[in-house]
Amino acid sequence: MRAVLFDVDGVVLDSMTIYQRVWAQWCMLVELDPATVWPLTHGRRPQDTIALVAPHLAIDSEMRRLEAFLDKESSPLPAMPGAHELLAALPPRQWALVTSNSETFLRSEFALLGLPWPSVIVDGSSVQEGKPSPQGFLAASARLGCAAAECLVVEDAAAGVEAGLAAGMTVLAIDPPPGGPGLATAHARFPSLEAASGAIRDWILADHSAAKVP
């Protein structure tokens, strides 16, 4: 059986502008440079970013600050073009979400948007190590009953691409112009989820011997 493992932020949800604003507010509060911190957040769990850039601060209290800033933003976060159609077209037991975000938060966002919800989600609190560790992707494939080699990872961050490759999976990167750092090692790159939809559907529908990501 083949499966697709989706990152969420920047892939399914168009959330990066809002998250950049949230991190900028947090950086101002703790006197860090937003331009330095923001690139380090891509693909990482928030708690891992805090530990990396502010090891002197208590992670739990800083997470609450980030959540408070996020709560002030409008909800729901917008879905990426083509996300609903793609997820609705995939067999429910053949796709999962692997995200640094919170399952509780995403359940609410997906419900508000009317997006299909998967049978398997591995969120940031479900694993000991976040991306670029492959733990999340391997956990998702195991829960789906699918071998790692039969999984297609859809990512937009270098840490996620690294995690997917380390898991032994095929990796498709969502890489809008002018192109992001660290995505060149993916097996394929597309400018948007909508542009990648055909290749993702082919991965699920095609025979193992014939299927490939261009």
What is each of the regions a protein language model found here?
Residues 1-91, 102-103, 107, 115:
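N-terminal helical cap/lid subdomain that shapes the substrate entry/recognition surface
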Residues 1-2, 94, 102-214:
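Asp-based, Mg2+/Mn2+-dependent phosphohydrolase catalytic module
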Residues 9, 36-39, 52, 73, ...:
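Short, flexible active-site loop motifs that bind/organize anionic cofactors or intermediates
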Residues 14-15, 41, 97-98, 155, ...:
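Small/polar loops that bind or transfer phosphate-bearing groups
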Residues 79, 98, 129:
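Residue-level marker of regulatory loop/turn positions in helix-turn-helix DNA-binding domains and
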